[in-house]
């Protein structure tokens, strides 16, 4: 099945599970995820573990890690559980064709078996340093060959490093659309991160990306957005003025999906520290926040969770 048809099915699944009545409220003290709830100790390792995000049904936890057993660099791994109240099992490597010898990270599961992710593999036709790809699992649970989204100016991928894709389908709401949020940045040459959005065009492919100006601070590095399922709250990583450490998690909201976002505010010291908090992601109901913290007490980056 082609990319667009799969995304369409994913959109129906997400739209059917949209959140109602959740507001941006205070978070509890964040905890290292493998130390609570009977979760498997291997969710975090002495390696780099980050980019955590749940599947819409809450039964799979996707992460990026450079732990032993991967294909090279950062790989995408997934832990599963039998119910939303059960502990997470040990993460398993997704293998090829998703993972490669290059960095493969920022997984974003959608619907029933769809997955956006970033790859820095230098394949023919690559747009830039890290591009957004989409893949899906077939009925046998096998991942299809990933498809790269179009290069700029026709599509969202650019010569820079795209990160943190976040798929939002609010097309059933007034002024609602099907959108893919993400960030662009570069370490060398140094280009500070900015948040962008690309609209899926009339059932066709994702179109040109535009900067979400109200979420961006020209003097800061704003990266890795994640939008709540109802499209009314977004979390992101930033080092803007007011940050407690190298990177903090910030949040913005809006009353309606067609409105501009509010000015981002720091989520506070229950979550943010003097370390770097990155790639935040909200659960489907908006009641849980996952993120990476670097350095962690165990590895160069560890996965944390908080609730509200």
Regions found by a protein language model. Give the residues of each.
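Bacterial N-terminal signal peptides
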Residues: 5-16
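Short, conserved micro-motifs composed of acidic
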Residues: 20-308
């Amino acid at each position: 099945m082609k990319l667009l048809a799969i995304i369409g099915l994913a959109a129906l699944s997400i739209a059917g599970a949209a959140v109602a009545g959740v507001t941006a409220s205070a978070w509890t003290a964040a905890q290292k995820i493998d130390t609570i709830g009977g979760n498997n100790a291997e969710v975090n390792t002495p390696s780099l573990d980050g980019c955590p995000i749940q599947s819409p049904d809450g039964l799979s936890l996707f992460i990026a890690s450079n732990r032993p057993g991967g294909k090279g660099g950062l790989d995408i791994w997934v832990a599963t559980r039998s119910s939303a109240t059960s502990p997470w099992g040990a993460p398993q490597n997704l293998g090829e064709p998703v993972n490669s010898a290059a960095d493969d990270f920022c997984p974003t599961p959608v619907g029933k078996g769809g997955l956006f992710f970033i790859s820095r593999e230098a394949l023919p036709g690559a747009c830039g340093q890290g591009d957004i790809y989409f893949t899906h699992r077939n009925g046998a649970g096998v991942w299809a060959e990933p498809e790269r989204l179009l290069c700029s100016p026709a599509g969202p991928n650019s010569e820079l490093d795209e990160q943190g894709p976040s798929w939002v389908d609010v097309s059933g709401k007034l002024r609602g659309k099907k959108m893919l949020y993400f960030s662009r940045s570069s370490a060398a040459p140094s280009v500070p991160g900015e948040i962008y959005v690309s609209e899926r065009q009339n059932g066709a492919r994702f179109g040109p990306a535009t900067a979400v100006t109200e979420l961006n601070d020209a003097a800061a590095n704003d990266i890795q957005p994640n939008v709540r399922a109802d499209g009314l709250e977004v979390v992101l990583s930033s080092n803007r003025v007011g940050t407690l450490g190298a990177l903090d998690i910030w949040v913005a909201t809006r009353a309606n999906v067609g409105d501009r976002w509010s000015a981002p505010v720091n989520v506070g010291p229950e979550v943010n520290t003097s370390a770097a908090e990155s790639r935040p992601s909200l659960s489907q109901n908006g009641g849980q926040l996952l993120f990476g913290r670097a350095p962690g007490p165990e590895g160069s980056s560890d996965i944390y969770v908080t609730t509200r």
